[in-house]
Amino acid sequence: MLIDGKQMHIQITKGDIGRYVILPGDPARCEKIAQYFDDPKQIAHNREYTLWTGSLDGVPVAVCSTGIGGPSAAIAMEELVECGADTFIRVGTSGGIVDKVKGGDIVIATGAIRQEGTSREYLPIEFPAVADFSVVSALHEAAQALGFPYHTGVIQSKDSFYGEIRPAQMPIADELTAKWKAWKAALMIVAQVLHVRCGAVLNVLWNADNDDAPAIPPDATERGVKAAVEAIRVLIREDSKA
């Protein structure tokens, strides 16, 4: 929706950004992420949406915060697509569920359990929330190149950050890698509706079921960002061959 020639919420227009966008939740992280770009500059700030642009390998890229939760994340993706974006990597944090996922690891999401509300406004619950294969592959290549400990798997998206896992839901945990990523399922579903690419990489802060988890390395919260940036470089190279 345009108001005075700009998208209503993110306050930019077509031509302001390129194809590739990193999506953190926290507006304060945008400037930090943009420092990995060449020629970074802030181009918009409105409500929870802060937007910086720059380039990687000579190709325009951007970072846009989404705030907390599925509704605001869906708005960001909808409006970014209207402005020309078609490839998204969500960068965030999570807790681990299975014992092998430790604090300091990163998780590359292949799909998400839709236990939130936003995605249901787009597609019925039977429709799976899955990440784009090319983005997952690029993140996998990036994590290997950077030497980060990583895992791939399904994550759990819920609307309640503090909500307890009910006993009846516990069997789900055996098949999950990470949980408490409130809006990833929403982004995956919106991306499929809009026919764009979306993936996610999460920094694991702790293991929810392991009190003896090792101390988190100082650079742990930046590992997901570095993996996302390197994955975009991979996608740029692959897309240039198409």
Segments and roles (model prediction):
Residues D26, V63, G92, I155, ...:
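Buried hydrophobic positions in well-ordered alpha/beta secondary-structure cores of metabolic enzymes
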Residues A138-L146, V190, A227-E238:
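Generic non-transmembrane alpha-helical segments
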